[in-house]
Amino acid sequence: MLSLVVSNSFAQDKADASAAPKMSELLGNNSVYQYKTEPVYDPKSNKSFFFWMGKTGDIYGREYNHETKAWNPSLSQDSKKIMEFTRTPADRHNYPSVVMAPNGHVLVLQEDHLGSKDGYALMLYTSPKPGSIDGEWSNQTLWTEGQPSYPTAVAAGDSIYLFMRRKVEFIWRVWQFSKSDDHGKTWTEPRTIVDTENKEPDNLNEIYSVAKKFYDPVNKRIALTWNLAGGKDHNELNKDLYMACLSTTDHKMYAPTGADLGEKVDLSEMQDPNTKVMVLGTEAQDGEKTGPIVDYTHHANYLEDGSFFITYNNMSKKNGKQSLMSAKWTGSDWKHSVIEEKPFQEALTRYGSVQQVKGSHLRVSIIDDELFKVRIKETKDAGETWTQVCEEVFDTKGQLLNCADFIFPYRPGYPQILVGTMPSKDKHDTKPKVDMPIWAMGDGSQK
């Protein structure tokens, strides 16, 4: 197992690679609270692309050439400003979401998460040429009504599927999708695919399906996981974990059992024990004071036999445990397994993201908040056993680690993860006012 303390020096890109396995490099000190990041790898150009939000909301980025092992811009230079987006202060919801278009252009989505008096919008930025961040990016506004938020997109064949949340009422928010068949130039009208229809008894009528989605090319489907939030106030309480699939053939929703759920999943279908859409039923827990019980970070992958494999957090103050978990679909039900577990406390150990290496070989990133540490664990038997690959301690300059997101799709070698920070004084502050560091992290291999 490899362990290394990272120094905040731009000179790291000049270090002798033969001295030790490359573990991390500082990409910039111009980041703010990243809710999440979505680094991507492009096999055509053999480059990985990294983007983050700056203090005023501007989007910055760098690309890594795996053949030359060089950064663009080099780490001795400032990162490239992809798009100017001045909001003072920035809002953590305005993080960049990234997808490679089928034609090789890099697409970056950004929401404008403002107060209702200012309105909301969802923007799309497109690289001027394939496989590169160089040049002046184009900018188009996709939607402004219904407060479009938490965008994430996935390429499926020659199409791109964009998922987002829309607001119906203050504590009634639904999940939608839109499709582009021309590399992001035009989009279908968004359609609701998950909706409680404002019928949840405790007013938990907000859908959260924030994490990155993955496409199953064999069965032509995209799995979505989500949890419920709401209560007396917006996002006050949080509970449950659900999963269903959007078919890219007929655009219907399907349960894990294969049951046809129609154009959208409603509350009765979520809670029907026969559909197995509910992966985990939980108590309602106060997300601000104790951390959401299933967090907002949960992903669904597909194993060789087509079964689903979900990774998620389960932080129960009532049960006194914080657990990093997996759930495997057996063909008739969900089998839950512990990745690791410890007593519940304020300084959380959190699951960050997942990377499918191949089939039953998967990796997860784990964040130890106040230890300033990110770890990688892996399983080669679909969650039966887990071993630690490496760990990294970061010099955060007093901030807390917030996100550790794998590059998608998997490519062996350096780098593997984009690591971001959040305010140490108030981790629920949505509008941090200081610059924070952001890094690329490896797994100790240098291929």
List PLM regions with ranges.
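Signal peptide processing junction and immediate N-terminal pro/mature segment
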Residues: 8-12
